[in-house]
Amino acid sequence: MENSVLQESEPLSCVEDNKSLGNTVLEETGAEILVAQIRLNIQHPNHKEVIIVVEGEDDEKALKKFFNVQAVEFYCTGNCLKVKNVMQIVSTDKQLKYCVIGIKDADFDHINKISHNIANLMITDAHDMETMMLTPNVCRKICLETINKEYPKLSIEAMLSLKNISYLRYYNDKIILKRGSYKDGISFQGIDIAQVASNSQPINVQSVLLYVKGKGNSNKTSFPDLNTMNLFIQQNPIDDGDLILFTNGHDLVYAIRNILHSIAPQEARKYSDKNIATMIRICYAKEEFEKTDLYKSIDNWNNNRFKLWAV
């Protein structure tokens, strides 16, 4: 491409994102403390009209360009549970419910058919921000930038290759963490996606379990054995059309990088996972965002009260 998307700059952010590849065990929240901090913010004489609470830096980077920065400021909490708990308080607060909203990754909410019914809480249309933004148009631009040709199967191949590691993440969320056993949750710290996903084909379940168990999970009695995992997969079938609801965006970025490197080792090698993540955010257009349920939810909440959107 004549003008590389990587030449564009990105907005600064408030905190370091802790939603790294390895972050799965959610910490206890101090929602009341965060709400108190937000209340102090809006009492400042130079405060913005609307505060948008998000999980971390990547979410702010992805969303900021769509909003009127004169009217909106972002507040980063660190994880999705904090966003939800803060919004539970905000939605019943006579002052804050009119000027504060939270945006969280859906994670497995769509797969589990979970509706939070919290007025000020909005969720992504897909599993998370990256999967929502990785539209066919965005994939096309990434391919033209990195390998200088179109590769329409990029996204689906990457998601299919991740299916078994995605199932393990789903087991962690649906079985282990839902019991409230956060300390027993599976750690995905230090996972090399190349060890659990091979381009368009998933690594077999047994190999995924052995590899992840060796990454700090050897002594966890909650870690599933092969029979348990196979039964879980059988009982929770995921159609290919639902993979955008099922696939972790950080995993997806790594898998896309690996596929691009395999297609064009010379041309694509200079593009890292961070470069790919940046391209997803930059290439995702306002016109595509305006078609999402996330946009419509925010716009309905606003109800023309504030000049919320960037022109």
What are these regions (language model features)?
Residues 2-311:
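Acidic, divalent-metal-binding catalytic cores of TOPRIM
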